[in-house]
Curated annotation (Swiss-Prot):
Residues that bind NAD(+): G240, S241, S242, A243, T244, G245
SUPFAM superfamilies tied to this protein: ALDH-like
Organism from which the protein derives: Atriplex hortensis (Mountain spinach)
Listed GO CC annotations: chloroplast
Documented EC number(s): 1.2.1.8
Record protein name field: Betaine aldehyde dehydrogenase, chloroplastic
Gene3D superfamilies xrefs: Aldehyde Dehydrogenase, Chain A, domain 1 (3.40.605.10), Aldehyde Dehydrogenase, Chain A, domain 2 (3.40.309.10)
Family: Belongs to the aldehyde dehydrogenase family.
Reaction it catalyzes: betaine aldehyde + NAD(+) + H2O = glycine betaine + NADH + 2 H(+)
Length: 502
């Protein structure tokens, strides 16, 4: 679909600025493999300029600065929500074109960013609620002292976001950081930065103070790493692979810098024998093929009770073959291309390795015959799995699900927890007591019961084990960007009397 990509520069201190080294990165449409534009490539020199701008914005006009008044910030967040709603169709087109996700999904993503009950509007309310929490009293055992708590913004934060939900994942970080009073330097993925740059224009249009949000597109080693290691960045929040997260954690540790990491996953979905098969099959497909399979929390390890496995898998194959794979702008598209040639090759290698290790490719596993161009992969179901196989252990980040059977509840839990990851999991059963037992036993940060993937801004999001730590969203998300300060006062007129007066 022909749709012009706006030509943008880096967004620094409220202005569009050419990168100091003047380099650009091509934008490739994953549906056609064609170059459709380019984005600026920031380097350490640009990071320095952006951090200075963010620090200046954080300190500007003492008493009336960005960090001072919670309600002052809330009005900007609401203005951003309104402006994105106004430009919704523009953002949807760009997101679909740049990322390859079906247009219907892009609509939902942009709605989540903008609508009054979601991200910016929600965190605007959180910003106002923080006014009420300031100076919250602390009960002490000694009457001569009184104590209260202050919540203050951490400072300048570095935000590094992924390519699977470009603007939405940016919003998960930007909204709470700004609501908390921080100023920010954002580095989106070079594979999908277009809507993130357009967000800078929205900030200008609503009059966001210069330097509060700075947007640097570029490669991880050139732009992301300098953000993490910069001594004037007070915190880093990252969403991406566990391998990159480990490097960020190691770099930040040199300065004892706090980090929030939302990393990879290999999430299980457990199907007990009492389920409604048709309902459960649809949720299973949604849990792994949504966003073209590129979901950190994808429930890509299906554990199904042996008594219903044959029927369940048969219905799953039929449902899967009915999924419309097409150009993401086509009406009814439910699976588009993966993000890049590199990702396409990686996923196909996973499928090839699974076959060589003895697994069966029951459905899919190759390029759709009717799509000769673009990074399209058929939704793939793999059976005859052993727990030693790569496909069982490693995150694929594509439209691939592996299937294994179990006999007992204990075996299902053991198999579900047989992973170094712990982002999410799902359990399906009409026995809600069993669901509660399994929920408590799963070593994950989020559990879905009789569904997969619904995510709401009001609930915490994050993982355990190698899926990271810290929580985004809800009141937990804004606390990520606040320092807690204890203030204790002596309210007695009597001397302390510990030392003898000379």
């Amino acid at each position: 679909m022909a749709f012009p990509i706006p030509a943008r520069q880096l967004f620094i201190d409220g202005e569009w600025r050419e990168p100091l080294l003047k380099n650009r990165i091509p934008i490739i449409n994953p549906s056609t493999e064609e170059i459709i534009g380019d984005i600026p490539a920031a380097t350490a020199e640009d990071v320095e300029v952006a951090v200075v701008a963010a620090r200046k914005a954080f300190k500007r006009n003492k008493g009336r600065d960005w960090a001072a008044l919670w309600s002052h910030r809330a009005k900007y967040l609401r203005a951003i929500a309104a402006k994105i709603t106004e430009k919704k169709d523009h953002f949807v087109k760009l997101e679909t074109l740049d990322s390859g996700k079906p247009r219907d999904e892009a609509v939902l993503d942009i709605d989540d960013v903008a609508t009054c009950f979601e991200y910016f509007e929600y965190f605007a309310g959180q910003a106002e609620a923080l006014d009420a929490k300031q100076k919250a009293p602390v009960t002490l055992p000694m009457e001569r002292f009184k104590s209260h708590v202050l919540r203050q913004p951490i400072g300048v934060v570095g935000l590094i976001s992924p390519w699977n939900y470009p603007l939405l994942m940016d919003t998960w970080k930007i909204a709470p950081a700004l609501a908390a009073g921080c100023t920010t330097v954002l580095k989106p993925s070079e594979l999908a930065s277009v809507t993130c740059l357009e967000f800078g224009e929205v900030c200008n249009e609503v009059g966001l103070p210069p330097g509060v949000l700075n947007i640097l597109t570029g490669l991880g080693p050139d732009a992301g790493a300098p953000i993490v290691s910069h001594p004037d960045i007070d915190k880093v929040a990252f969403t991406g692979s566990s391998a990159t997260g480990s490097k960020i954690m190691a770099s930040a540790a040199q300065l004892v810098k706090p980090v929030t990491l939302e990393l990879g996953g290999k999430s299980p979905v457990i199907m007990f024998e009492d389920i409604d098969i048709e309902t459960a099959v649809e949720w299973t497909l949604f849990g792994v093929f949504w966003t073209n399979g590129q979901i950190c929390s994808a429930t890509s390890r299906l554990l199904v009770h042996e008594s219903i496995a044959a029927e369940f898998v048969d219905r799953m194959v039929k449902w899967t073959k009915n999924i419309k794979i097409s150009d993401p702008f086509e009406e009814g598209c439910r699976l588009g291309p993966v993000i890049s040639k590199g990702q396409y090759d990686k996923i196909m290698k996973f499928i090839s390795t699974a076959k060589s290790e003895g697994a069966t490719i029951l459905c899919g596993g190759s390029r759709p015959e009717h799509l000769k161009k673009g990074y399209y992969i058929e939704p793939t179901i793999i059976t005859d799995i052993t727990t030693s196989m790569q496909i069982w252990k490693e995150e694929v980040f594509g439209p691939v699900i592996c299937v294994k059977t179990f006999k007992t509840e204990d075996e299902a839990i053991e198999l579900a927890n047989d992973t170094e990851y712990g982002l999410a999991g799902a359990v399906f059963s009409k026995d809600l007591e069993r669901c509660e037992r399994v929920t408590k036993a799963l070593e994950v940060g989020a559990v879905w019961v009789n569904c997969s993937q619904p995510c709401f801004v009001h609930a915490p999001w994050g993982g355990v084990k190698r899926s990271g730590f810290g929580r985004e969203l809800g009141e937990w998300g804004i606390e990520n960007y606040l320092n807690i300060k204890q203030v204790t006062s002596d309210i007695s007129d009597e001397p302390w009397g510990w030392y003898k007066s000379p």
